[in-house]
Amino acid sequence: MKQVALGRSGLMVSELCLGTMTWGTQNTEAEAFAQMDMATERGVTFWDTAEMYPTNPVSAETVGGTETIIGNWFAVRGGRDRVVLATKITGKGKTVRADQPISAATLRTAVEGSLRRLQTDYIDLYQLHWPNRGSYHFRQMWRYAPRFDDPAAIRDNMAEVLRAAGDLVAEGKIRALGLSNESVWGAAEWLRLAGVENLPRMVSVQNEYSLLCRQFDTDWAELSVLEDMPLLAYSPLATGLLSGKYAGDVVPEGTRRERTPDLGGRVTAQVFPAVSAYLGLARDHGLDPCQMAIAFTRQRPFACIPIIGATTLAQLESNIGAADLMLSDEVLADIDALHRLYPAPY
């Protein structure tokens, strides 16, 4: 597996990242262990998790469960030094800390909790799961209204978080900082504040990106290239839509859609025609649709590392195979044509 630089962090990571959010709900600990074993054997040594995982659904009873499973794997298998481990502090919400925003205090509490569950003494990449001020992600862009009572307080909080993160870096508890579900303004402001106060610089951003969700392609892409801030693309298969398993608006037993019928707002009148078109494109070119979708994210004009999640070893094996696929100019041109027809199906 090829290794790539994670922006300006000094970290080298595998060109695919292993997603973990189903471990503890859709997947048992034994199944998660098997996935980590396979990933390690195949060189996928960049792993992403979060303190609030597992999802599908998120619940107070399962918070921290995925990190615990990963920590148990390290305890049994060893090899913490072989893995570049990313996790996240939960943003404001009811599940983890009862509507407390990300702050200096909650940052330290969250880091120390993750370290205990992960059974490690350091986190390679520590990410802010979503901004305190809200976000247009999670299908909120259709009604997004940026209204802020106190912009100065927003900036003060950001600086406070960076200072606290700097302390944690100095203590060796985290190595690098990253963003998630962030906006271009937010990323630019985090970078500006870090430069002004000589504080840790955000090195990456984890946002949704796939053939069906391409909000990153314009302003974000420009910032990514000019600031050397790679995208960690979550949902490169659009929560399984691009695999074809839901084609025809079906709900197969045991799938994510059985637990979340609308796939977090992704099931719309437009999405199935778009999915059908991309499945047809893959078929016409003799490609596996999942591998085509993942390979697409790796051939963008900005640095992009797709996060591949799976509920079975067969799915994981196939997704890892996308690292060996290079899409032809003809395939990319056909993708561009379909994107014009279906620019934002959800």
Regions found by a protein language model. Give the residues of each.
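Active-site mouth loops of central-metabolism enzymes
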Residues: 20-30, 93-105, 148-156
